Amino acid sequence: MFIIELIKGIILGVVEGLTEFAPVSSTGHMILVDDMWLKSSEFLGSQSAFTFKIVIQLGSVFAAAWVFRERFLEILHIGKHKHVEGDNDQQRRSKPRRLNLLHVLVGMVPAGILGLLFDDFIEEHLFSVPTVMIGLFVGAIYMIIADKYSAKVKNPQTVDQISYFQAFVIGISQAVAMWPGFSRSGSTISTGVLMKLNHKAASDFTFIMAVPIMLAASGLSLLKHYQDIQIADIPFYILGFLAAFTVGLIAIKTFLHQINKIKLIPFAIYRIVLVIFIAILYFGFGIGKGI
């Protein structure tokens, strides 16, 4: 049984790594894979299972931090500054770097404030299967609207052309995505595209903005619940973290490489299919009724 439970922990880490930064809602997938299937709370205990999810989320966040490590060093003025994104080498040499620490802070403020004010309310009232399905569906529609709009935009902006106003509006959408199932990246990438950024630029800023706020949120949660960690459960935490980190690295790099080509609609369609699947399990078979 111990080996089977370790495998379950690895599976959850893989799911977290695949979905945390993709616009598909990691919350929706964790409900489907864990709460409806693997049920980590049964072999870890409810409190330890909650802490386990924080740890594997940190694995994904560290993966994003590693992918963007050079950009973070540049934003913090550590190390050598690289060229600015532009259409050609001459543009890159002539433009000063525009993305800076203030952009990131401006984007973090709305979610930070609302998180402090409503975190307990959201955790108590919105973490249910029906509310997550609503978030998945509404988020999918928003992504489709953004993609349809982006097709009309000529010369979309790069991440180094982002303004403080754009950063703030994208930050507001990150706060809206606190609704479970809506998806932080789905919301912020869509908003970035609606603000005339290209898909890659919107994705880059989404990840750069998300890393510090998620590190802070997950770190605080871990400090609150670290006493729930049992020595016997440490192998689950280690393997889950490593799985989330490794798969997260691959998923993030692949996503960033392909997003300008595939856009958001394929992810939106997937989300709608996921809603239908969860609805069948929940309403048709009663699976997850206790969540």
UniProtKB/Swiss-Prot annotation:
Keyword annotations from UniProtKB, A to Z: Antibiotic resistance, Cell membrane, Cell shape, Cell wall biogenesis/degradation, Hydrolase, Membrane, Peptidoglycan synthesis, Transmembrane, Transmembrane helix
Transmembrane spans: 1-21, 48-68, 102-122, 126-146, 162-182, 203-223, 231-251, 267-287
Enzyme Commission number, as recorded: 3.6.1.27
Catalytic activity field: di-trans,octa-cis-undecaprenyl diphosphate + H2O = di-trans,octa-cis-undecaprenyl phosphate + phosphate + H(+)
UniProt GO molecular function: undecaprenyl-diphosphatase activity
Recorded topology in the membrane: Multi-pass membrane protein
NCBIfam families: PRK00281.1-4, undec_PP_bacA
Protein name as catalogued: Undecaprenyl-diphosphatase
Origin species: Staphylococcus aureus (strain COL)
